[in-house]
Amino acid sequence: MAIVLGAKERKDKKHSTLRRIRSQGGIPAVLYGKKVDNKMISISAADLEKALREGGRHSLVTLKVDGEDYSVLLREVQRDPLRGELLHADFQAVDMSAEVDVDVEVRLVGEAPGVKDGGVLQQNLHELSIRVLPANIPPAIEVDISGLQVGDVITVGDVQTGGTFEINHEPSEVIATILPPQQEEEIHSGEQQEPGQPEAEEGRETTPEG
């Protein structure tokens, strides 16, 4: 999906200017890159939120700054910790012929037989760092779990890249596994305590009276 964002260059970073930008529905941002002069810009907060929803956090973006186009990656987003509103964004201009390192969502697909048998699906990695040409950045890396039985694991080495990217992880790193069903005694650990009997404090032994 092609993502296009419009932006305007701003000339200063005074607090009054930043407040005015935010009051008008925008956010301040910066554009930087090896072959690009650093620019202070402003963009529509609503447009960036839409781009994040539709394309994800690490998609390639065409950023139009006062009529000039840049191929960029969104490298950092700052939000208000209480309201969650966008506050600032950093865009990195990229060379379309040079590989970049990006983090991409891991999306588990399929239904694992082990889960149907009572096992518990545990996902250890929710993102993978990959090295890829900007035009080939996938929206997500799908990992098929439809063959997993209880006790089975899927590792980084099992991921099919199609030759379009390299994964910056050890092949032995676990992406997902099916844990055995919990036994009843594990769920209700320890015997039920008799009424009136005080609990033993952790790290101390209790001795019978008398």
Swiss-Prot record:
InterPro entries: Rbsml_bL25/Gln-tRNA_synth_N, Ribosomal_bL25/Gln-tRNA_synth, Ribosomal_bL25_b-dom, Ribosomal_bL25_C, Ribosomal_bL25_long, Ribosomal_L25_dom, Ribosomal_uL5_bac-type. GO terms for molecular function: 5S rRNA binding; structural constituent of ribosome. The gene is rplY. SUPFAM superfamilies: Ribosomal protein L25-like. Residues 179-210 are annotated as: Disordered. Residues 201-210 have a biased composition (Basic and acidic residues). One of its GO terms (cellular component) is cytosolic large ribosomal subunit. CDD domains: Ribosomal_L25_TL5_CTC. This is Large ribosomal subunit protein bL25. This is one of the proteins that binds to the 5S RNA in the ribosome where it forms part of the central protuberance. It comes from Geobacillus thermodenitrificans (strain NG80-2). Keywords: Ribonucleoprotein, Ribosomal protein, RNA-binding, rRNA-binding. Belongs to the bacterial ribosomal protein bL25 family. CTC subfamily. The keyword Ribosomal protein applies. The keyword RNA-binding applies. Part of the 50S ribosomal subunit; part of the 5S rRNA/L5/L18/L25 subcomplex. Contacts the 5S rRNA. Binds to the 5S rRNA independently of L5 and L18. Signal peptide: none annotated.
